[in-house]
Amino acid sequence: VRATVVGVLAGLVRWVGLAFALVLVIHVLLTVGRANPDNGITVFFADAAQPLALAFRSLFTPENGDLRVLVNFGLAALFWLIGSAVLARLIRRLG
């Protein structure tokens, strides 16, 4: 039973990290792709991505807004992917 719970928990951590990274990547694609900023989908992903970007949101401040979104939100996506993988591995190892 314990192994099952550990496996499910580790899998859940990975899926959450993947979902967070996906939201950030979609926001980057919509921004760099010049999606209509008033569209509901664009607004949804922009709003959802802001808290997920954590401190990466303003880590780099290049003049070009697209580059700023690409670098900062891209780094945040990498953080969630790597962080969730490390945490899932730790859960499995300690479990």
Predicted regions and their residues:
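N-terminal intrinsically disordered, cationic/polar leader segments
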Residues: 3, 7-13
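Hydrophobic, lipid-facing residues on alpha-helical transmembrane segments of integral membrane proteins
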Residues: 17, 48, 74, 78-86
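Hydrophobic alpha-helical segments of integral membrane proteins
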Residues: 12, 41-59
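Membrane-interfacial segments
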Residues: 33-37, 87-95
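Individual transmembrane alpha-helix segments
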Residues: 62-77
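Alpha-helical membrane-inserting segments
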Residues: 25-29, 56-57, 83, 87-91
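N-terminal signal-anchor transmembrane alpha helix
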Residues: 13-34
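Helix-boundary and loop/linker segments of multi-pass membrane transporters
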Residues: 1, 59-63
